[in-house]
């Protein structure tokens, strides 16, 4: 039986940079935008990027995307169970 090959999803040119926010950063984000955690857009725990990062439900991801006009912009996703 052949060994399963691993693919680093973050090396693909179309996959933006992801990182897990610390608890302090998460609280600051919620305070800055005056929102509750339930108001964040969601991303499923089975998403390949979430699995690759090892994020758990309840974690908040910061995603850095390229923009033709702004250079880069950040958006945030709450990891939820499937």
UniProtKB/Swiss-Prot annotation:
An individual GO BP term:
tRNA transcription by RNA polymerase III
Its EC top class is transferase
Q: Which residues form a coiled coil?
A: none
Superkingdom of the source? Archaea
Q: Which Gene3D superfamilies match?
A: RPB5-like RNA polymerase subunit
Localization per record: Cytoplasm
What Pfam family does this protein match (any one)?
A: RNA_pol_Rpb5_C
User: E.C. number, please?
Assistant: 2.7.7.6
What is the first-listed, main subcellular location in coarse terms?
cytoplasm
Gene Ontology CC: one annotated term: cytoplasm
Q: Any keyword DNA-binding?
A: no
GO molecular function list:
DNA binding; DNA-directed RNA polymerase activity
Functionally, this protein is described as follows:
DNA-dependent RNA polymerase (RNAP) catalyzes the transcription of DNA into RNA using the four ribonucleoside triphosphates as substrates.
Similarity comment: Belongs to the archaeal Rpo5/eukaryotic RPB5 RNA polymerase subunit family.
PANTHER family assigned to the protein according to its UniProt record, in alphabetical order? DNA-DIRECTED RNA POLYMERASES I, II, AND III SUBUNIT RPABC1 (PTHR10535:SF0)
Supply the name of the protein. Answer: DNA-directed RNA polymerase subunit Rpo5
Gene name of the record: rpo5
